[in-house]
């Protein structure tokens, strides 16, 4: 625990960078997960699934 404190939380600048980086990765993971769930629920109804019929 002391190693994490000394590397990330001791200085305000590294603490801010750690927060920004973790927010970025959390947002990406949430976005990818929600898109996968949405596409799984709506499989067969999305444009990418039916556009072959209309081209």
UniProtKB/Swiss-Prot annotation:
Domain of life: Eukaryota
Topological region Chloroplast intermembrane: 42-55
Transmembrane segments annotated in the record for this chain: 16-41
Record keywords: Electron transport, Membrane, Mitochondrion, Mitochondrion inner membrane, Respiratory chain, Transmembrane, Transmembrane helix, Transport
Subcellular location: Mitochondrion inner membrane
Record membrane topology: Single-pass membrane protein
Mitochondrial matrix compartment residues: 1-15
Coiled-coil region list: none
Cellular component GO terms held in the UniProt record: mitochondrial inner membrane; respiratory chain complex III
Chief location: mitochondrion
Listed GO biological process terms: mitochondrial electron transport, ubiquinol to cytochrome c
Entry similarity comment: Belongs to the UQCR10/QCR9 family.
Biological role stated in the UniProt entry: Component of the ubiquinol-cytochrome c oxidoreductase, a multisubunit transmembrane complex that is part of the mitochondrial electron transport chain which drives oxidative phosphorylation.
Subunit structure: Component of the ubiquinol-cytochrome c oxidoreductase (cytochrome b-c1 complex, complex III, CIII), a multisubunit enzyme composed of 3 respiratory subunits cytochrome b, cytochrome c1 and Rieske protein, 2 core protein subunits, and additional low-molecular weight protein subunits. The complex exists as an obligatory dimer and forms supercomplexes (SCs) in the inner mitochondrial membrane with cytochrome c oxidase (complex IV, CIV).
Protein name, as recorded: Cytochrome b-c1 complex subunit 9
Record organism: Drosophila melanogaster (Fruit fly)
């Amino acid at each position: 625990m002391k190693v994490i404190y000394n590397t990330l939380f001791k200085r305000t600048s590294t603490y801010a960078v750690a927060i920004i980086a973790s927010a970025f990765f959390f947002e990406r993971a949430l976005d990818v997960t929600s898109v996968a769930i949405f596409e799984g629920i709506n499989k067969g109804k999305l444009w990418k699934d039916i556009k072959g019929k209309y081209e």
